[in-house]
Amino acid sequence: MADEAPRKGSFSALVGRTNGLTKPAALAAAPAKPGGAGGSKKLVIKNFRDRPRLPDNYTQDTWRKLHEAVRAVQSSTSIRYNLEELYQAVENLCSHKVSPMLYKQLRQACEDHVQAQILPFREDSLDSVLFLKKINTCWQDHCRQMIMIRSIFLFLDRTYVLQNSTLPSIWDMGLELFRTHIISDKMVQSKTIDGILLLIERERSGEAVDRSLLRSLLGMLSDLQVYKDSFELKFLEETNCLYAAEGQRLMQEREVPEYLNHVSKRLEEEGDRVITYLDHSTQKPLIACVEKQLLGEHLTAILQKGLDHLLDENRVPDLAQMYQLFSRVRGGQQALLQHWSEYIKTFGTAIVINPEKDKDMVQDLLDFKDKVDHVIEVCFQKNERFVNLMKESFETFINKRPNKPAELIAKHVDSKLRAGNKEATDEELERTLDKIMILFRFIHGKDVFEAFYKKDLAKRLLVGKSASVDAEKSMLSKLKHECGAAFTSKLEGMFKDMELSKDIMVHFKQHMQNQSDSGPIDLTVNILTMGYWPTYTPMEVHLTPEMIKLQEVFKAFYLGKHSGRKLQWQTTLGHAVLKAEFKEGKKEFQVSLFQTLVLLMFNEGDGFSFEEIKMATGIEDSELRRTLQSLACGKARVLIKSPKGKEVEDGDKFIFNGEFKHKLFRIKINQIQMKETVEEQVSTTERVFQDRQYQIDAAIVRIMKMRKTLGHNLLVSELYNQLKFPVKPGDLKKRIESLIDRDYMERDKDNPNQYHYVA
């Protein structure tokens, strides 16, 4: 290891010939380590020669050669020397430590040339486009020249310049000189920027311009690092002014769809400018400027002027474009949301609030819901905010008219589930029921729906008018899923009653087969649990002896199996099939029990007065008039009324129509008494209100029993949380007063707004 130090010293001498890529001083020979046997040894390199000395004037002569080549490049003339020879000359100079001088001389040569280029641009006679072309040519020439010069002086660039961080590369030096002596000249810069802005303005006006010229010049400004300060700020300022004026003008002149198309076109054009010739950094502020001036400043005006019309006309592409554009602007979606909600509430209220439109209300609501759903899906990209606000808006307007929408939705379900409905398939019926359930969710007074739905369901079940048992069960399942088992328990009980009645009738018919005198009447009885079914007003009528006898037989049979129960006959729900003989032949009539009692009288005589029929049947006055109307004034006129007329009056006479003709064998005579009258509607609604009072009373007592003492406001708040139907504060106050009167609770003697539970 004693010879390590001399090896280092000799190696530094070798490195001294490495063309300046490494600094020899950094590798100076280290002193020999102590401990050797005598002095340090030297490593001798055979055939080592000292660096040859340059001839006198070599540096000056070589620079003249290089300077001549530089001038040739700058003047675009041929170079007398080949590039390899010039490159080697630069390498030789750098190897002999004249790099600083060489760099300085090269910079001066380039600077002299660039300074000479400014003179032609100071002529005032050039128009803007010619000026831009001239400055672009100058820039292109300068770039080409600097590339060539750099290739000649590449060794200098990669050694001396690279090792000196304070020096710009030859290329950067060229950019700096061009920026300093040409583009930074106030007149040149002003004409260049103004010319570029003029070309862009012309292009925005629809003229064709030289885009490659713009791309080159803006690239020059970017390369020279003056793009943002000298061009972009002024460009954005002019853009802002242009689109501010354009937005104001076009909002006055154009309809909203046309205006939105123009905005989309402008945004596309500006985006294309960024791609084609503007610097990428300009994209964000440029697009933001267009959006602000053409959209942001006019959001409310656009919506007020055009949204309602687009929605009324179902202009789906235009609405999609509006959503897409408004989503680009801060506050745009929120503004669209608010107007969207107002439109839904206004349009929906017009459907719900007008009694003249009650006939078509539910179908109109379903169609409107389909329409807004389609708009949300296709135009608003299923945006959850639009979906949720649509639901809130539907809930708001549909409850502006209490009770009626709930009633009509129940009737609409009835029309779909009744036999003879026009739904083509089970799948279509199922889809319709799903849509109806969506409307049902929006209703606050679901108890009103339940009351009318139950009444109509009873008719369908008792008269056998259901289109499909599966559809009925499906609807029941939907209601149960939506409102819970408590809501549908009575409805499910109605179905159970019908199934149990079928079993009972099977056993009853078997029982009757064993009887010696079963009679001519085939009786079918439905046993209904009173708590499940709607409340029916009982009517005592005079049945025929055969009917009374059969009733007693069934009563004995049923109570024999179910002792302790009580049967109450509901004559208003009875119906029958009657056989009749006419001159033209035999017919069968599907009629109500009241119609049956009237027609059976004509087995005893050919004609009776209104008063005689009333006395014989015991049917209540108004019900009898409707019954006789159906038999004598309808399409199937089994009776002839005298005098003729549509209304049944006191003293009218009725005779049997022996000449009756009809193309069908079995004829169904409209059961007018089963059609809902105004009185029935009022009665159903009143029962709902009565039930609500009971529920309010029960809730108040339940709360007070638990809390013992409670303030008025807290009690009302608790009630709102517990009750599942809308209720007014005044109604709650009345129920509280009623309970105080009935000693369920009492007021505090010192604080009238405080209540105490009375055990």
Swiss-Prot record:
One of its GO terms (cellular component) is Cul4A-RING E3 ubiquitin ligase complex. Residues 691-751 form the Cullin neddylation domain. Pathway: Protein modification; protein ubiquitination. There is a cross-link at residue 8 (Glycyl lysine isopeptide (Lys-Gly) (interchain with G-Cter in SUMO2)). One of its GO terms (molecular function) is ubiquitin protein ligase binding. The keyword Ubl conjugation applies. SMART domains: CULLIN, Cullin_Nedd8. GO terms for biological process: cell population proliferation; cellular response to UV; DNA damage response; DNA repair; G1/S transition of mitotic cell cycle; hemopoiesis; in utero embryonic development; intrinsic apoptotic signaling pathway. It holds the Pfam family Cullin_Nedd8. Keywords: Biological rhythms, DNA damage, DNA repair, Host-virus interaction, Isopeptide bond, Phosphoprotein, Ubl conjugation, Ubl conjugation pathway. Signal peptide: none annotated. InterPro entries: Cullin, Cullin_CS, Cullin_homology, Cullin_homology_sf, Cullin_N, Cullin_neddylation_domain, Cullin_repeat-like_dom_sf, WH-like_DNA-bd_sf. Transmembrane segments: none annotated. There is a cross-link at residue 33 (Glycyl lysine isopeptide (Lys-Gly) (interchain with G-Cter in ubiquitin)). Neddylated; required for activity of cullin-RING-based E3 ubiquitin-protein ligase complexes. Deneddylated via its interaction with the COP9 signalosome (CSN) complex. There is a cross-link at residue 705 (Glycyl lysine isopeptide (Lys-Gly) (interchain with G-Cter in NEDD8)). Belongs to the cullin family. Can self-associate. Component of multiple DCX (DDB1-CUL4-X-box) E3 ubiquitin-protein ligase complexes that seem to consist of DDB1, CUL4A or CUL4B, RBX1 and a variable substrate recognition component which seems to belong to a protein family described as DCAF (Ddb1- and Cul4-associated factor) or CDW (CUL4-DDB1-associated WD40-repeat) proteins. Core component of multiple cullin-RING-based E3 ubiquitin-protein ligase complexes which mediate the ubiquitination of target proteins. As a scaffold protein may contribute to catalysis through positioning of the substrate and the ubiquitin-conjugating enzyme. The E3 ubiquitin-protein ligase activity of the complex is dependent on the neddylation of the cullin subunit and is inhibited by the association of the deneddylated cullin subunit with TIP120A/CAND1. The functional specificity of the E3 ubiquitin-protein ligase complex depends on the variable substrate recognition component. This is Cullin-4A. The lineage of its organism: Eukaryota, Metazoa, Chordata, Craniata, Vertebrata. The gene is CUL4A.
